[in-house]
């Protein structure tokens, strides 16, 4: 007679074993109708799974985040069901849940077109509208193997052969004539899978290995109701308008080409953005007392072996040979910074030593994963390493946290999610060391008034870390900043300092990044601002336009005044109508558009309007320059107002 304890503490006793669905029905028909699955003693279970002992139960519906994730997973099965009806010869690989949706990898000789995606969407809708029941059957490994062998599903057979023990009892989910294998849980009825949309198709290697066959991956999104689906699709539409690749081309910021995959060709205006971003971070380095250094781009393999990177990152490193020596282009800056630290004897009085670099790094990312500025092979890290004593860890981490928040606030990012990753199962050091280091990070976060989530066991083997994830205007998450303690690398590379008692000690190393990759962060900013950069960051801050040729000399005079005061200004003296010029520079997202005619020339003024069409009226040249320079010095996010 199981006793079921519900989240509110109430208990229900049953004479026989029950399922989550049975308990929901006992509570009321409305809950039974809405029940998707259950969390039994902390573990997700199908609504049909039997509970035969006293248990704690949470009933999951589409209102729960877990419920939405489950229905997305079931939509992947629905996609498989529809696919096999339209292309019976297709072989199904895997269909997991991803952020906001799902995908399925399929082996099919026919290359899918948009018309095929539309046909799949239609068939999925038809199937879901029948509200058919999903039947879960748990059986032996051999039953599952025979089932998929009879259906010619070679990828499912491979998963069984290589990833599932013959002692296990895999769950098969029957969607009418279609059968799929999964850990589950899944919806009990397809009535829950009504609000979905197939989004795109792409190539994907089986198991992510380029030596394997290229499959076709169909992506989809699914939500609990029509309203949520519509909101998401509207957000995607806005994201498409803000796509940094599209805006980058429109504004002539950069380009990429096949001869240098994952490498950026910065154009004049894009490079201006890059340099301004670098200048800003360099000022922050000065405020927080960092040394700026520059390490070599390439180092001998021997050093990477000593640091431990060769064992872990060799496949991602570009290498070359010269004079019988093998070199690797650096994928990260930390080993080089330890080499700089090791030059000359260091005392405890020299610590903390804060070392920063705009390090140009290269990683051999898979070609299929490259994505504009967001995922590249050549990138610049705003990387820093703090060498300190263990007693200094908390204060140094606290300073790093302040620097991260100061920086993000300048760009308007205020929704920051912070996660603390703690000791993994395989790690160096004793528990006492980990207790101290984790406590130091916790105290630093608490001292800065920062709420954080703990990720147990997610730290690196050499130390715990803090991750900073910012959310943009479309509520997308971007993990950028990290503060990572490292108790291993300094020792591996022989870093020591003379302690107060004259003993040789190994410093603690703090890895610190704020933006992460400058290229990626610029991609984020392009999309966050939709190309409308704040005045201080904008490649061109002011454009001055004449109405007739009579004002040409005056335009030159105005532009020169602006340039002398440090404002990035240009002129447009083309023999075009002023309305045409204004429209063109508005599309270029120049913050301020200045028009001069005879009256402005005679009065030594400029007529000012913003790229958003706000007319600020006439101003004296010096007054406008003063206001703009104040905006720039404050790094204001807003334009001048009327």
UniProtKB/Swiss-Prot annotation:
Q: What molecular functions are annotated in GO for this chain?
A: ATP binding; metal ion binding; threonine-tRNA ligase activity; tRNA binding
Q: Name one GO cellular component term.
A: cytosol
Instruction: Report domain TGS positions.
Output: 1-61
Provide the family line: Belongs to the class-II aminoacyl-tRNA synthetase family.
**Per its UniProt record, what SUPFAM superfamilies does this chain match?**
Class II aaRS ABD-related, Class II aaRS and biotin synthetases, TGS-like, ThrRS/AlaRS common domain
Q: How is the cofactor bound?
A: Binds 1 zinc ion per subunit.
Role of this protein: Catalyzes the attachment of threonine to tRNA(Thr) in a two-step reaction: L-threonine is first activated by ATP to form Thr-AMP and then transferred to the acceptor end of tRNA(Thr). Also edits incorrectly charged L-seryl-tRNA(Thr).
Q: What is this protein called?
A: Threonine--tRNA ligase
GO BP: threonyl-tRNA aminoacylation
Q: Which HAMAP family match?
A: Thr_tRNA_synth (MF_00184)
What is the required cofactor set for this protein? Zn(2+)
List the subcellular locations. Cytoplasm
**Residues engaged in binding Zn(2+):** 334, 385, 511
Subunit-level organization: Homodimer.
**Reactions it catalyzes:** tRNA(Thr) + L-threonine + ATP = L-threonyl-tRNA(Thr) + AMP + diphosphate + H(+)
Q: Where is this region: Catalytic?
A: 243-534
Q: Which Pfam families match?
A: HGTP_anticodon, TGS, tRNA-synt_2b, tRNA_SAD
Q: Keywords, A to Z?
A: Aminoacyl-tRNA synthetase, ATP-binding, Cytoplasm, Ligase, Metal-binding, Nucleotide-binding, Protein biosynthesis, RNA-binding, tRNA-binding, Zinc
Gene expressing this chain: thrS
């Amino acid at each position: 007679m199981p006793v079921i304890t519900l989240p509110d503490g109430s208990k229900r006793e049953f004479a026989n074993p029950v399922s989550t669905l049975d308990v929901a029905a006992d509570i009321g028909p409305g809950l039974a109708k809405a029940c998707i699955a259950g969390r039994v003693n902390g573990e997700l279970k199908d609504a049909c799974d039997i509970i035969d002992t006293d248990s704690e139960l949470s009933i999951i519906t589409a209102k729960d985040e877990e419920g939405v994730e489950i229905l997305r997973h079931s939509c992947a099965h629905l996609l498989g069901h529809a696919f096999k009806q339209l292309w019976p010869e297709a072989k199904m690989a895997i269909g997991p849940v991803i952020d906001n949706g799902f995908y399925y990898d399929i082996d099919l000789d026919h290359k899918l077109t948009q018309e095929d995606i539309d046909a799949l969407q239609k068939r999925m809708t038809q199937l879901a509208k029948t509200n058919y029941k999903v039947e879960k059957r748990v059986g032996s490994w051999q039953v599952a193997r025979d089932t998929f062998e009879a259906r010619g599903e070679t990828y499912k057979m491979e998963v069984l052969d290589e990833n599932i023990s013959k002692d296990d009892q895999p769950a098969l989910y029957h969607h009418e004539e279609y059968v799929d294998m999964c850990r589950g849980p899944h919806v009990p009825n397809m009535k829950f899978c009504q609000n979905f949309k197939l989004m795109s198709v792409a190539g994907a290697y089986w198991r992510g290995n380029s030596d394997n066959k290229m499959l076709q991956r169909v992506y989809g999104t699914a939500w609990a109701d029509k309203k949520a689906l519509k909101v998401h699709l509207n957000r995607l539409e806005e994201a498409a308008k803000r796509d940094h690749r599209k805006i980058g081309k429109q504004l002539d910021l950069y380009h990429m080409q096949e001869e240098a995959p994952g490498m950026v060709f910065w154009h004049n205006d894009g490079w201006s953005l890059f340099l301004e971003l670098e200048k800003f971070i360099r000022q922050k380095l000065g405020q927080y007392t960092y040394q700026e250094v520059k390490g070599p781009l390439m180092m001998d393999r021997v050093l990477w072996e000593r640091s431990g990177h060769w064992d872990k990152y060799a496949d991602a490193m570009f290498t070359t040979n010269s004079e019988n020596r093998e070199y690797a282009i650096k994928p990260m800056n930390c080993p080089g910074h330890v080499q700089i630290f090791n030059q000359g004897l260091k005392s405890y009085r020299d610590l903390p030593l804060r070392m920063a670099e705009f390090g140009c790094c290269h990683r051999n990312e898979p070609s299929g994963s490259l994505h504009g500025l967001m995922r590249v092979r050549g990138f610049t890290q705003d990387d820093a390493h703090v060498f300190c004593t263990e007693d200094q860890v908390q204060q140094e981490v606290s300073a790093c946290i302040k620097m991260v928040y100061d920086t993000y606030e300048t760009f308007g990012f205020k929704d920051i999610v912070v996660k603390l990753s703690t000791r993994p199962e395989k790690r160096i050091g004793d528990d006492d060391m980990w207790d101290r280091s984790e406590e130091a990070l916790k105290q630093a976060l608490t001292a800065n008034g920062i709420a954080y989530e703990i990720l147990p066991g997610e730290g690196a083997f050499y130390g715990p870390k803090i991750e900073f994830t910012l959310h943009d205007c479309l509520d997308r998450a971007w993990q950028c900043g990290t503060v990572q303690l490292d108790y291993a690398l300094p020792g591996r590379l022989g870093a020591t300092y003379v302690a107060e008692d004259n003993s040789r000690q190994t410093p603690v190393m703090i890895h610190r990044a704020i933006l992460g990759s400058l290229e990626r962060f610029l991609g984020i900013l392009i999309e966050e601002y939709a190309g409308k950069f704040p005045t201080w960051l904008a490649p061109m801050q002011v454009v001055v336009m004449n109405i007739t040729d009579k004002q040409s000399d005056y335009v030159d005079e105005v532009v020169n005044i602006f340039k002398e005061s440090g404002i990035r200004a240009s002129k447009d003296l083309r023999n075009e109508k002023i309305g045409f010029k204004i429209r063109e520079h508005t599309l270029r997202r120049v913050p301020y558009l200045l028009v001069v005619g005879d009256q402005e020339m005679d009065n030594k003024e400029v007529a000012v309007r913003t790229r958003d069409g706000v007319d600020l009226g006439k101003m004296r040249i010096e007054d406008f320059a003063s206001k703009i320079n104040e905006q720039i010095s404050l790094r204001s996010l807003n334009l001048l107002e009327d």
